[in-house]
A protein has these predicted regions:
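Short amphipathic alpha-helical face segments that pack within enzyme cores
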Residues: 18, 22, 88-92, 96
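Metal-dependent nuclease catalytic regions and adjoining charged, substrate-binding loops involved
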Residues: 77-83, 92, 96-160
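Extended aliphatic helical segments
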Residues: 5-12, 34, 38-40, 88, ...
Length: 160
């Protein structure tokens, strides 16, 4: 529920939304835009998400484009590849839509500079994602600590 999300987190998501709006205009102007906010879903294991953009690509019929806004320090730390969790997200989308190629594009929140990293579909990574989902879904005991990201709701959960 949107109202239960911390106001600061809501502002972070809103900032990302303005990036998507601007990018849509740029993609349309460059005649690269095909579609946006495309929902994808896998039944088993249950995985769902929303692809930011599907764009035209000169070497592929089309490509997936995921947009991320990122703070200055993290932006400068990105050298060779996208953040692992963003690569995983794009791998899921590539595999669920049977596409071979995508891009994660970052916008620096401080100065709007951009960095983009290509991601090729990787069957091994997809297999590992499915194995991890299966492992989590079949756990019989709760983990002692949460290993999720800082925003994971499990971080604040206390064992009773």
């Amino acid at each position: 529920d949107w109202d239960s999300i911390d106001a600061r987190i809501q502002r972070i998501f809103d900032h990302g939304g303005t990036f998507e709006g601007r990018m849509k205009k740029y993609l349309e102007k460059a005649d690269l835009y095909i579609d946006d906010e495309v929902s994808v879903k896998n039944e088993n294991p249950p995985i769902s998400g929303r692809i930011d953009f599907i764009i035209k690509h000169d070497k592929h019929t089309d490509a997936l484009l995921e947009l991320k806004t990122i703070k200055n320090e993290d932006f400068h730390d990105l050298k060779e590849a996208p953040k692992h969790e963003h690569m995983i997200q794009l791998q899921i989308y590539l595999n669920l839509t049977d596409r071979d190629y995508g891009v994660v594009m970052y916008e620096n929140k401080n100065d709007q500079n951009l960095k983009a990293f290509k991601v090729d579909r990787d069957e091994k990574v997809w297999h590992d994602i499915l194995k991890r989902c299966e492992k989590i879904m079949t756990m019989t005991t709760e983990p002692e600590t949460c290993t999720g990201m800082w925003y994971c709701k499990c971080k604040n959960r206390r064992k009773e």
